[in-house]
């Protein structure tokens, strides 16, 4: 993209806004290097990255890249095997800390599988491949406190040396303290302090005593009144301290070398982390800019078609900017904009040009969703007064020089923008030149926008296929532009109307009208009529919008009324459902009692008659319950057609009393697949209810093939009973009740967990199972089932 267009359209100001949102120096570097792209796939990729980052910003908040250092030079030193300093290692630690922060922000894992919250997008892989290298980072942080300080615990050797240094220091201070407090030396001291000179402990001795005091002189004050002397009593200790300092430095260098070797093994991961963090910083800066500008992702096409919906120039104060709609490149490829000065013509040009540059650079544009941009290899712009004083060029010459260059280089893949084409010279010749230039560009099918004051160009646009007029609206009443762009309508000269409004006499205005040609006045009358028609159309449109709002309000009230009716219906159905639950509970209680009696009577023949009577009563009771519930359900349930079901609908599977979602459309027989949790089953539509249409009437009671009753899910029972810790007299009633419920729920087998212990509880359970008639058999658990701590019970 040519530099002149970038400068003219103020693209660099957008880049400055973008760079300010990057947190790291490398991120800002990438922002400053951003230029428009020309490959569709690259542009779409960058746009999607910006959108995905924006989605994450709204979902999780900001991700900080602030303070991430540039370690490129450090990595180059690692390449040649150099040992790093403490400061360099701390920079690497900062990068690794930022890497971990980014990893946690962008990629969540659970059980080694990506969670649903961490949705796949264009950024997921970047986050996933980041390597925080936590062991290395922790080791650096453990060993290095700051650029000037290594931790005592960095190595046993360093800890030992520093302990010896402390001991030696203490000895020196003890010895010097004795000297300071000695009566024989108090008079020799300039000050009663201990000082350091050339790395050795000294005392400040008065100049006249420097030869009397026993020791080695290392320095003297600037006035010569004080000599700094190392007492002979601590010379040996000072020597030891110097040796220990050398050993300390050797230990530190050893620690830094070991850390450098450790870091060098991961230099490629470090390089990837640095590069990826810079890219993410760059991407999230683009997302932040989109958020600040309230922008949206534009759609792109290869048809050179532009359709900007409510576009706002990003460099104009958001409180003052007026959104504009601009479209061209479909039915017409040349747009001629007319209107008053300061009316918004130039802003319209710059908006189209700047949006094109921003979009092709992967930036969102401040416009409504659904806006479209096209890809142009070059954008050429001749906007504003670019007169060159150095070259002594007039305004016209300057613009014409630029125009000549544009005509030489532009092709059908270019976007050309002219502001006041042909201005700065004789109006007749200027208009002729402007028409010739636009005609030339139009013949070559080059997408062009041009602003003008010339009426001849309005006529050119009206009479030429593929060319359209547009104007910036001006209010004669307020004498102010509205900044609205009206496509399809040429701009009308408002000079006479404005002059009259400002008080110019009618005589002068009428005299002026005589000086313009009848043809020109007729043309202005046509434009006036068009403007009047447009205003009338907008009035009709406003009335239609009002009618639409009234209809919507009526629809809303009707929906509220229907909602109240539905609520009443739902209440009635809930009451019916509760009644069904009551009937079902009564049937269950009756069945429980009957089974207990059956167990009590046992298999003896004397009680056969009583048992048979109870069976008959139970069958009658359950039959009544079943018929009652089924009839209520069928009466209240809507019969659905195959066309009523769509993939994703929430449904109630009546026979299973489970909720699920439709995963396929019904086949010719009315069968479709329903996903119920991890279960996917083929179900006929006659066995389904749409949950959002009708509240479930009753929990279905369906007969199984064996004739037993399968209870609803709400009355389902656990497949195991834990009685560990219970006494026999406490456990057996629980076992008895549990077996009854499990048998009624039609469980094929259950597990009783009694534990090993003394075996008394297991024996009591086994004895009880032998007396239970509907138990087919039992056994202790096998390997993996609980062994002798559980009993597996199988029902008849």
Curated annotation (Swiss-Prot):
Pfam families: MSSS, MutS_V, Smr
InterPro entries linked to this entry: DNA_mismatch_repair_MutS_C, DNA_mismatch_repair_MutS_core, DNA_mismatch_repair_MutS_sf, MSSS, MutS, MutS2, P-loop_NTPase, Smr_dom
Alphabetic keyword roster: ATP-binding, DNA-binding, Endonuclease, Hydrolase, Nuclease, Nucleotide-binding, RNA-binding, rRNA-binding
Binding residues annotated for ATP, in chain numbering: 339-346
Gene3D superfamilies named in the record: 3.30.1370.110, P-loop containing nucleotide triphosphate hydrolases
Residue ranges, annotated region (Disordered): 620-644
Known EC number: 3.1.-.-, 3.6.4.-
EC primary class: hydrolase
Family matches, as SMART domains: MUTSac, MUTSd, SMR
HAMAP family noted in UniProt: MutS2 (MF_00092)
Function in brief: Endonuclease that is involved in the suppression of homologous recombination and thus may have a key role in the control of bacterial genetic diversity. Acts as a ribosome collision sensor, splitting the ribosome into its 2 subunits. Detects stalled/collided 70S ribosomes which it binds and splits by an ATP-hydrolysis driven conformational change. Acts upstream of the ribosome quality control system (RQC), a ribosome-associated complex that mediates the extraction of incompletely synthesized nascent chains from stalled ribosomes and their subsequent degradation. Probably generates substrates for RQC.
Family classification: Belongs to the DNA mismatch repair MutS family. MutS2 subfamily.
Protein's UniProt name: Endonuclease MutS2
Organism of provenance: Lachnoclostridium phytofermentans (strain ATCC 700394 / DSM 18823 / ISDg)
């Amino acid at each position: 993209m040519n530099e002149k267009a970038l400068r003219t359209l103020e693209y660099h100001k957008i880049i400055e806004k973008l760079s300010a949102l990057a947190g790291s120096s490398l991120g800002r570097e990438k922002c400053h290097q951003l230029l428009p792209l020309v490959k569709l796939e690259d542009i779409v990729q960058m746009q999607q990255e910006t959108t995905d980052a924006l989605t994450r910003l709204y979902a999780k908040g900001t991700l900080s890249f602030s303070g991430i250092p540039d370690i490129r030079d450090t990595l180059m030193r690692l390449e040649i095997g150099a040992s790093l300093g403490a400061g360099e290692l701390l920079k690497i630690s900062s990068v690794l800390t930022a890497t971990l922060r980014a990893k946690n922000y962008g990629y969540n894992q659970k059980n080694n599988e990506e969670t649903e919250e961490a949705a796949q997008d264009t950024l997921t892989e970047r986050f996933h491949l980041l390597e925080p290298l936590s062991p290395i980072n922790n080791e650096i942080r453990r060993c290095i406190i700051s650029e000037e300080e290594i931790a005592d615990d960095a190595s046993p050797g360093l800890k030992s040396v520093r302990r010896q240094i402390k001991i030696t220091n203490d000895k020196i201070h003890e010895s010097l303290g004795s000297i300071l407090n000695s009566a024989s030396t108090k008079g020799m001291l300039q000050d009663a302090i201990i000082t350091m000179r050339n790395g050795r402990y000294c005392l400040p001795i008065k100049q006249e005593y420097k030869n009397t005091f026993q020791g080695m002189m290392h320095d003297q004050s600037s006035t010569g009144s004080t000599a700094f002397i190392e007492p002979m009593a601590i010379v040996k200790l000072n020597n030891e301290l110097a040796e220990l300092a050398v050993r300390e430095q050797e230990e530190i260098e050893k620690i830094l070398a070991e850390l450098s070797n450790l870091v060098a093994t991961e230099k490629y991961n470090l390089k990837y982390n640095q590069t990826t963090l810079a890219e993410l910083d760059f991407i999230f800066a683009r997302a932040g800019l989109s958020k600040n500008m309230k922008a949206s992702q534009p759609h792109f096409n290869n048809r050179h078609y532009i359709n900007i919906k409510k576009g706002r120039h990003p460099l104009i104060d958001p409180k003052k900017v007026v959104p504009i709609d601009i479209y061209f490149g479909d039915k017409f490829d040349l747009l001629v904009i007319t209107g008053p000065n300061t009316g918004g013509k130039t802003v319209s040009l710059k908006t189209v040009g700047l949006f094109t540059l921003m979009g092709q650079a992967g930036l969102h544009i401040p416009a409504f969703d659904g806006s479209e941009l096209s890809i142009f290899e070059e954008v050429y712009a001749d906007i504003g007064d670019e007169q060159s004083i150095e070259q002594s060029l007039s305004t016209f010459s300057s613009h014409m020089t630029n125009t000549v260059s544009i005509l030489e280089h532009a092709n059908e893949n270019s976007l050309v923008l002219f502001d006041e084409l042909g201005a700065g010279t004789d109006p007749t010749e200027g208009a002729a030149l402007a028409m010739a230039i636009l005609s030339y560009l139009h013949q070559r099918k080059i997408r062009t926008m041009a602003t003008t004051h010339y009426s001849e160009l309005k006529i050119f646009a009206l009479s030429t296929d593929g060319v359209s007029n547009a104007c910036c609206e001006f209010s004669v009443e307020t004498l102010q532009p509205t900044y609205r762009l009206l496509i399809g309508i040429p701009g009308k000269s408002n000079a006479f109307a404005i002059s009259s409004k400002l008080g110019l006499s009618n005589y002068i205005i009428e005299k002026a009208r005589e000086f313009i040609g009848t043809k020109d006045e007729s043309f202005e009358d046509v434009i006036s009529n068009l403007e009047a028609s447009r205003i009338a159309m907008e009035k009709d449109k406003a009335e239609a919008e009002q009618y639409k709002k009234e209809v919507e309000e009526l629809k809303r009230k009707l929906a509220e009324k229907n909602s109240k009716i539905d609520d009443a219906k739902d209440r009635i159905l809930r009451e019916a459902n509760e009644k069904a639950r009551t009937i079902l509970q009564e049937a269950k209680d009756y069945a429980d009692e009957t089974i207990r009696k059956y167990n009590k009577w046992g298999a003896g023949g004397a009680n056969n008659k009583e048992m048979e009577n109870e069976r008959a009563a139970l069958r009658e009771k359950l039959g009544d319950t079943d018929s009652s519930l089924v009839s209520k359900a069928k009466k209240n349930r809507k019969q659905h057609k195959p066309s009523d079901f769509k993939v994703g609908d929430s449904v109630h599977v009546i026979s299973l009393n489970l909720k699920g979602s439709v995963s396929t459309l019904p086949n010719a027989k009315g069968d479709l697949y329903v996903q119920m949790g991890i279960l996917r089953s083929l179900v006929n539509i006659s066995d389904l209810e749409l949950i959002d249409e009708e509240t479930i009437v009753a929990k279905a009671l369906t007969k199984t093939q064996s004739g037993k009753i399968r209870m609803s899910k709400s009355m389902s029972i656990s497949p195991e009973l834990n009685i560990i810790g219970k006494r026999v007299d406490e456990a057996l009633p629980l076992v008895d009740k549990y077996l009854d419920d499990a048998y009624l729920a039609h469980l094929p087998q259950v597990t009783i967990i009694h534990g090993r212990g003394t075996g008394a509880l297991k024996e009591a359970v086994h004895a009880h199972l032998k007396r239970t008639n509907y138990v087919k058999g039992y056994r202790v658990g096998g390997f993996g089932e609980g062994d002798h701590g559980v009993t597996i019970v199988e029902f008849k």
